[in-house]
Structure formats: structure tokens, C-alpha cells
Amino acid sequence: MSATAALGIVPPPAPISDAFRSTMRRFPATVTIISACRNGTDHGMTATAVTSLSMDPPSLLICLNNRTYLHDMLLEVPEFAVSILTDRQVALSEGFSGKIAPERRFEAADWVRHARGMMVLDSAHASVVCRRMGAVPYGTHTIFIGQVVDTRFSQDTIPLMYENSKYCAPQHALPTSQN
């Protein structure tokens, strides 16, 4: 029985799935690399399904396809890291999306080993290290909840974004009613 059937989820008709996929492609998302280490083996992959969850306790969630190697790894390891890429790291994103063999991915760029064991990108726009607090399967993906144990950020970089199958970056801040 599939995870979808086990949860009682009825797959939508193809036209809704296709329309939803097209709609979601238009949601701009920050590009990240999620990394973890299991038994001395590092692994990481590019992901955009990352969001803050709570400030008390500080936490975020990531969503990973159930068929990925990192998904299985995160079910076993207690912690993971999220490195938010800069607008100058498109090639790194592509490499961690499959253009570089998994065992060679951390040879590119300035990865450093965090005190908790996993690799974190030193030149990232921001990075967050989390303790895995939960994993909720839903359909083809699992939502991993991470409680923040460490974080750092740069004041001088621009985040890399992805929208409609293209990399992009914020151009400028727009005025708000407060400024």
C-alpha cells in the first residue's frame, strides 16, 4: 500500500495536479542545500521547500521527497543543516541537484564541518543547524521538523531564489507603509 493510500489521500485528477504544479512553479523560493552526516558519510541536496515554523521554540521545517537518499538519512540522524545560497552560487545549486556525484559534492565551494558533525557552507547567505524533532509523512514527501541549535548569517550577500524553472535574485527592497 502506498503512503498516499495509507493516509487516505485521494490523488487529484490530472488536470488539477498539472495546474497545481504550474502554479507552484510561480512561487518564488529561496534556494538551499540541506546537509547531514551518517556514519562519517556526508550527503546534501538542493531544496526549496524550507520555511520557518516557530519562534518559540525556534524551529523550521523542510520537505523531502521520500525517494531521496537524504530523506532516508534524515530519518536516522539526529541533526541536519540548511545553508541558504547566495546569488553567486547557481553552479553549486546545480551540482547538489544532481550534476555532481554525491560523493564529490562537498569538494566544491567552502564547506566546513560544524561542531555537530554535518557540513555547512561557510559562504552561505545564512545557515541553520537543527535537531530533528519530528518527521511527518504526507503523500510523496516527508515534512521534517527541526529545532534550531545554531545559526549564522551574512549582512553582505543576496539570497539565491528560484521561480518558474529559473534562478533569480531580489532586485531591491520595495517601500512599505513603515518607511
Q: What do these predicted regions represent?
A:
Residues 2-179:
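Basic, polyanion-binding surface patches
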